[in-house]
């Protein structure tokens, strides 16, 4: 079996892999592959290496704020160079290596390393990255990123998309290159959702849905959970201003209500503001960063999950975020915006 070497520019609480990355690694490990994740520890405070149930995390330790696009752009080449050197070192002792690079910010390094080392490259595209950063960077830069991504796709041996809208976008880019639309339409996304699974097999571009492991969401625990004394609304995730997830607006609203508690978990530049607002409100509870292994239990214990993404951001509007599937797995309704593709799905399926 192969040694799969992943690259990712971010980690979550405690320096661990995000759920979607960890789930992919677990699946590969169960198939008999060995997995190494080369990840950028942007706190610069965690251990250099950690062994997990699915493989090993190797961390590039360099401080870099999550919301500072200019600083990130300056420091990104350092991470990509470090990743390349690690892979070249592994190649001296391993014969069967597959590269698995996550999102556009790593892809240029992935293509370079793939060509240099003559190794197959899988591009795991979690989101419309140019659409995500549009607003944090200028429209011109976002369009250049779109064209860059389209050019790099031709150098990938395989491409993975989780969401239907992103699949439709990538499919268009493979056909039209940089002239393809910046984003797919809602109609195109729903067409992809209706496609049979066999259409995603044995093709360069495939769709692997953001499915949760149900053993983390035991049915007996869900069916027997005790009713909360107050309605508990839960948000666990990144706490940043851009793109907005409606956290501050929700705090303002909930603080004026009775019979409800807002539980917030995560890390980011909004934490100091959230702590100040918490002091003024009895029904806002900031829990601090939540370990990925505890997210399922927190979700089961809640009465609803909040995922109010800003619809003005094109990536938000057409995404199928991780929180949607966590809420579904826990049999908990999700509160979101009807303008989102996710909102239309929630309304259609009556799950929030």
Describe these PLM feature segments.
Residues 1-45, 49, 158, 175, ...:
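N-terminal subdomain of nucleotide-sugar transferases
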Residues 4, 210-212, 216, 225-255, ...:
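Conserved donor-binding/catalytic core segment of Leloir-type glycosyltransferases
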Residues 23-26, 80, 84-91, 108, ...:
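Membrane-proximal helix-turn-helix segments that form the acceptor-binding/catalytic region
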Residues 142, 146, 150-204, 344-348:
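A short, active-site helix/loop in glycosyltransferases that binds the activated sugar's phosphate group
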Residues 241-245, 291-298, 305-325, 335-344:
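Nucleotide-sugar-dependent
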């Amino acid at each position: 079996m192969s040694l799969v070497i992943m690259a990712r520019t971010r980690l979550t609480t405690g320096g661990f892999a995000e759920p979607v990355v960890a789930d992919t690694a677990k699946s590969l490990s169960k198939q008999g592959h060995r997995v190494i994740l080369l990840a950028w520890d942007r706190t610069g405070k965690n251990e250099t290496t950690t062994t997990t149930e699915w493989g090993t995390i190797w961390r590039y330790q360099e401080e870099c704020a999550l919301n500072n696009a200019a600083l990130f752009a300056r420091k990104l080449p350092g991470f990509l160079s470090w990743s390349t050197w690690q892979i070249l070192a592994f190649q001296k002792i391993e014969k069967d290596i597959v590269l698995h690079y996550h999102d556009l910010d790593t892809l240029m390094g992935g293509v370079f390393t793939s060509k240099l080392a003559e190794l197959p490259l899988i591009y795991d595209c979690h989101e419309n990255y140019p659409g995500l950063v549009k607003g944090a960077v200028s429209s011109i830069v976002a369009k250049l990123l779109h064209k860059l991504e389209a050019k790099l796709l031709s150098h990938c041996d395989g491409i993975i998309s989780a969401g239907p809208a992103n699949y439709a976008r990538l499919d268009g880019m493979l056909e039209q290159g940089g002239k393809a639309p910046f984003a797919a339409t809602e109609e195109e996304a729903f067409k992809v959702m209706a496609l049979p699974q066999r259409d995603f097999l044995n093709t360069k571009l495939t769709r692997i849905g953001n499915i949760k492991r149900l053993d983390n969401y035991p049915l007996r625990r869900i069916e027997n959970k005790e009713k909360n004394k107050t309605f508990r609304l839960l948000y666990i995730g990144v706490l940043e201003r851009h793109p907005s997830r409606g956290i501050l607006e929700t705090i303002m609203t909930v603080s004026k209500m009775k019979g409800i508690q807002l539980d917030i978990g995560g890390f980011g530049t909004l934490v100091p503001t959230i702590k100040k607002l918490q002091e003024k409100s009895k029904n806002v509870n900031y829990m601090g960063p939540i370990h990925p292994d505890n997210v399922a239990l927190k979700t089961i214990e809640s009465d609803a999950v909040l995922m109010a993404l800003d619809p003005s951001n094109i990536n938000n509007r057409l995404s199928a975020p991780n929180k949607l599937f966590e809420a579904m797995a826990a049999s908990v309704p999700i509160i979101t915006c009807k303008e989102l593709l996710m909102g239309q799905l929630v309304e259609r399926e009556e799950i929030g």
